[in-house]
Swiss-Prot record:
Residues 249-290 are annotated as: Disordered. It holds the Pfam family Beta-lactamase. The gene is LACTB. The keyword Lipid metabolism applies. This is Serine beta-lactamase-like protein LACTB, mitochondrial. The active site is at residue 166. Keywords: Acetylation, Hydrolase, Lipid metabolism, Mitochondrion, Protease, Transit peptide. The keyword Mitochondrion applies. It comes from Bos taurus (Bovine). GO terms for cellular component: mitochondrion. It is an enzyme of class 3 (hydrolase). It is found in: Mitochondrion. Its main location: mitochondrion. The modification N6-acetyllysine is found at residues 304, 349. GO terms for molecular function: peptidase activity.
């Protein structure tokens, strides 16, 4: 301090009072204040000297060192209020994020489901996967694993937008159902009534009718991506033989169980004979190696079509593969024709009509996939090449199949859609107990029709079920007491170039108490999207739904 005081005094003496720099004094003068002169500096020196004297006097009073400074009183200091749990600046749904109150009941289910998804992701080598789960209409978990864009290391998150592929069929069904409810569409008259551009058809010389109802459930006979009728028929014959063999084995096991599990040489010989005969028939009827959808050229179309009517030229002149109504053949092209029917029945362009539906359902991130527009949070899509290396999928244009597989969405929007369908399905059951309930987007009788399995159909992603109207449906069943119980659920999967998806709805098994004290929707909805093609996700979604259903049953 002596040195500081001496320096100040010396500077004042040599510079004529400009000890603090002329710049500062000039600034002081510009503010209209008195100039800083030697008197001001002298006053400063006097003050510093007095302070130093007091300090020295205090130090000379005792020989013992001064005690350490006391810690500040925490009561005297201003305290910052702690952040509440929901205000913590952590990524939503990360393992470190404090769970919102309505999700804490499902901590076990979330941990278990996250582990399951990690295992599925690792098994198939998927770059990224996003999941969303709602319970009784409330979203309780959504999370992204891996990368939406591998090259730029962009992680998946709940807002990630991906191709939903054939879940688009379920969206199109809502448009058809709304037109049917309004009396603008008859499901059972020939499609030429609405779309005369589609030619009348014959099968084996007989004139046949293709209707909207048959198109919805894939019973029209219109082809899928495979153009070779012979290959398709061989494949169907082989599948039928395989299914018959499985049914025979199941019947034999059932008969054995009813007899107390006892077997005999006669039964064993008969079983061996059946297996041998079926194996011989299988060798004779087994088709040559069938290309899967991703080996079909039409899946990779790059041509842009202006509307659904123009898209019909891809298949409208092809022969039917079988008589309408007689067999099931999954067909995305059938939904291209349905889009044209929606246009003619509604008076709107198909995409405009669908955007109105998305707006009503609050599905604000669901759009048709186009390459030119900037779509925020859109993922990139991947496949493994012949060398088992991860590569980007080629450019495709989905304008020829908006209705059957051309939309983009998020897990959150798919949950909203699933809950809207579940609400409409259940609201009629609750009406007597609660007259204040709003109507569903679709009427209860409409949803019952949509979720009722149709005869002669197949549900390829779960052999226990049947195809209904743009949904696969598994019905409730239990064969033996204290044994496996099959839950009723509806779902649709999707497979596109570089993408896989599933939307699954598991309705609650309602009792009288629930009908009197609860409101719809009641049940679990699961949506999963993935930026890797050929990933089967239905069984994973069902396992996740059942995990959340377990935790849900424990809520008081």
């Amino acid at each position: 301090m002596y040195r500081l005081l001496s320096a100040v005094m010396a500077r004042a003496a040599t510079t004529g009072g400009c000890a603090w720099g002329c710049g500062r004094r000039a600034a002081h003068q510009r503010a209209g204040l008195p100039p800083l002169g030697p008197g001001w500096v002298g006053g400063l020196g006097l003050g510093l000297g007095l302070a130093l004297g007091v300090k020295l006097a205090g130090g000379l009073r005792g020989a013992s060192p001064a005690p350490p400074a006391a810690a500040p009183d925490p009561e005297a200091l201003p305290q910052a209020e702690p952040l509440q749990a929901q205000e913590q600046p952590l990524a939503p749904w990360s393992p470190q994020t404090p769970a919102p109150p309505h999700t804490r009941h499902f901590a076990r289910a979330i941990d278990s489901s996250r582990d399951l998804l990690h295992r599925i992701k690792d098994e198939v080598g998927a770059p990224g996967i996003v999941v969303g789960v709602s319970v009784d209409g409330k979203e309780v978990w959504s999370e992204g694993l891996g990368y939406a864009d591998v090259e730029n290391r962009v992680p998946c998150k709940p807002e990630t937008v991906m191709r939903i592929a054939s879940i688009s069929k379920s969206l199109t069904m809502v448009a058809i159902a709304k037109l049917w409810e309004a009396g603008k569409l008859d499901l059972d008259i020939p499609v030429q009534h609405y779309v005369p551009e589609f030619p009348e058809k014959e099968y084996e010389g007989e004139k046949v009718s293709v209707t909207t109802r048959l198109l919805i459930s894939h019973l029209s006979g219109i082809r899928h991506y495979e153009k070779d009728m012979k290959k398709v028929k061989e494949e169907k014959a082989y599948k039928a033989l395989k299914m018959m063999k499985e049914m025979m084995e199941s019947d034999q096991e059932k008969e054995l169980k009813e007899k107390g599990g006892k077997s005999n040489e006669k039964n064993d010989f008969a079983k061996a004979k059946v297996e041998q005969d079926n194996e011989t028939k299988g060798r004779n009827s087994k088709p040559c190696k069938k290309k899967n959808d991703f080996e079909q050229g039409e899946l990779y179309l790059k041509e842009k079509f202006e509307n659904s009517i123009e898209s019909l030229r891809l298949f409208k002149n092809d022969p039917l593969f079988f008589k309408p109504g007689s067999q099931f053949l999954y067909s995305t092209f059938g939904y291209t024709l349905l889009a044209a029917i929606v246009e003619r029945a509604s008076g709107y362009k198909y995409l405009d009509y669908m955007q109105k539906i998305f707006h009503d359902l609050d599905m604000l991130t669901t759009v048709q996939e186009e390459n030119e527009p900037v779509i925020y949070n859109r993922a990139r899509f991947y496949v493994y090449n012949k060398k088992k290396r991860l590569v980007n999928t080629p450019y495709v244009d989905n304008s020829y199949k908006w209705a059957g597989g051309g939309f983009l969405s998020t897990v959150g929007d798919l949950l909203k859609f699933g809950n809207a369908m579940l609400y409409g399905y259940q609201v009629g059951l609750f009406k007597n107990a609660n007259e204040n309930l709003l109507p569903g987007y679709l009427k209860p009788e409409t949803m019952l029709m949509i979720w009722t399995p149709v005869p002669n159909t197949e549900m390829s992603w779960d052999k226990e079920g049947k195809y209904a109207m743009a949904w696969g449906v598994v019905e409730k069943k239990q064969t033996y007491g204290s044994c496996r119980k099959q839950r009723h659920y509806a779902s649709h999967t999707g497979g596109a170039v570089g993408a896989s998806s599933v939307l699954l709805v598991l309705p609650e098994e309602l009792d009288a108490e629930a009908l009197n004290n609860k409101v719809p929707p009641r049940g679990i909805v699961v949506s999963i999207i993935c930026n890797m093609q050929s990933v089967g996700l239905n069984s994973t979604a069902l396992k996740i739904a059942l995990e959340f259903d377990k935790d849900r049953s424990d809520i008081p």
